[in-house]
Each structure stands twice: as C-alpha cells, then as structure tokens.
C-alpha cells in the first residue's frame, strides 16, 4: 500500500495497492483505495477470492469483465449484450459524450453510488437499483469494470469475475490508437503489468484475440456452469 505511483508499479508485491491522493488521481488500472477501511476490506476480498473461488455461477448474476486497458472489455460486453440473455445496466460517468449517462463532477459526487471508481481521471458509478432491474428480468448483467469495482460488485450481488486477456503488444497498440491524451496513454501503458497480476483472483479468464470467439467461449462457460 503506497500513494507514490512509482513505488506501486515497481514493487514485487503480488497485489500492489494505490492509496488515492490528489496527485495520483489520474493513475489507471491499479488496485486502489481511498482509506484504510477500504484497504482492509480489499485484502479480505482478495483472500476470499483466492481461497474460496466458486466455479458455479448463479443464473442470473453479474458478469464483471476486468483486464488491462486495450483488452477489449467494452467490445466483448457489447458483443455479449447482442444476445438476449445479457444486458448492460445504466451507469454514470463524468466524461461528456461517453456511452454512460453524463454527470458533472459536482452532480456525480452528490449521487448515492454503491460502486464507483476513477479511471484515467474520469469517475464512473453504478446504482444498486439499476443492477437489480436487470437481474429481475432474469438477464445476466454485463459490465466492464476495474478490479476494485468487480470486488465491490461481488460484495452485493452474485458475481463472476472474468479476466479478459490479450497479448501485450496488442494492448499497447490499441491504447496508442485511441483518442487519449499523451498523459493518459502513458498511464494506461504503465499499468498493464500490474493489471495482469489480477488474473489470479478472477473466477475465469477468456482470451480476447478475436471478439467473436471470446463471446462464444464466455457464453458457453456461463451456460455450462450455471446452477
């Protein structure tokens, strides 16, 4: 646990955790907390995920897609949600023009989100009632999340955490080709190796070299392991 980005990136620790401060708010992808209470809970969740991983999947449940920037989480989510039994819930963020519902920083901070995170300087949040509305239909909730968001989701709902894997060269190429600032591209690339470590505490992993094949693979996994 540290608030200095270079210390977190260079540590040999299996699960480095960033203590959020104003000077590191734009750092992307790392396990992060805002206070010691959140850190203690995060450690408990990592231990539980490592020791008591359950391969049985409740139907319906939340499918949390995690992985480095450029791994294709959003594309995989969109592909899954083209199928009848999968659905994206309503989510909120502080970036205008994004797929999420836009809120100003002031509006966002006034909302009651049960799960929220800051990614590359942008805040994202989810409301419990929006998740419940999708589950009530009998649909799987599909969400690209960072690891902290996925763990928070698992605290409240039946959740399967899926690591979306891709070759590092393709991750870097995808990040470079995106319409991000140089600073944001740099931060996303720097976080790749740290984010790859999170694969060990996920329930499943899918190789996303081809989104169609990854969609079929993950759909089959969910179907074959549902209770």
Task: Please name every model-derived segment.
Residues 71:
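ATP-binding Walker
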Residues 5, 150, 180-221:
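Small-molecule kinase domains that catalyze NTP-dependent phosphoryl transfer to phosphate-bearing small molecules
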Residues 142-145, 155-176:
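Conserved phosphate-donor/acceptor-positioning beta-strand/loop module used by diverse small-molecule
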Residues 87, 91-141, 147-148:
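ATP-dependent small-molecule kinase phosphotransfer cores
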Residues 65:
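Hydrophobic anchor at the beta1->P-loop junction of P-loop NTPases
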Residues 3-37:
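Acidic, Mg2+-coordinating phosphoryl-transfer loop and its flanking beta/alpha structural elements
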Residues 74:
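Walker A/P-loop
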Residues 68:
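P-loop (Walker A) phosphate-binding loop of NTP-binding proteins
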């Amino acid at each position: 646990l540290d608030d200095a980005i270079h210390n977190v990136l260079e540590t040999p620790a299996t699960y480095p955790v960033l203590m959020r401060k104003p000077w590191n708010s734009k750092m992307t992808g790392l396990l992060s907390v805002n206070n010691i209470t959140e850190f203690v809970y995060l450690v408990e969740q990592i231990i539980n995920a490592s020791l008591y991983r359950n391969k049985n999947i409740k139907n319906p449940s939340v499918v949390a897609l995690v992985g480095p920037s450029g791994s294709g989480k959003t594309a995989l989510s969109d592909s899954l949600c083209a199928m009848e039994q999968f659905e994206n819930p309503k989510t909120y963020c502080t970036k205008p023009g994004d797929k999420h519902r836009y809120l100003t920083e002031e509006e966002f901070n006034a909302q009651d989100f049960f799960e929220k995170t800051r990614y590359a300087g942008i805040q994202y949040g989810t409301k419990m009632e929006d998740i419940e509305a999708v589950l009530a239909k009998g649909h799987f909730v599909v969400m690209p999340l960072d690891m902290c968001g996925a763990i928070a989701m698992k605290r409240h709902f039946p959740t399967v955490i899926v690591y979306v894997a891709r070759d590092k060269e393709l991750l870097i190429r995808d990040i470079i080709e995106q319409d991000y600032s140089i600073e944001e591209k740099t931060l996303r690339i720097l976080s790749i190796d740290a984010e790859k470590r999170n694969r060990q505490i996920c329930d499943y992993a899918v190789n996303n070299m081809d989104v169609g094949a990854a969609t079929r693979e993950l759909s089959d996994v969910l179907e074959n392991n549902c209770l």
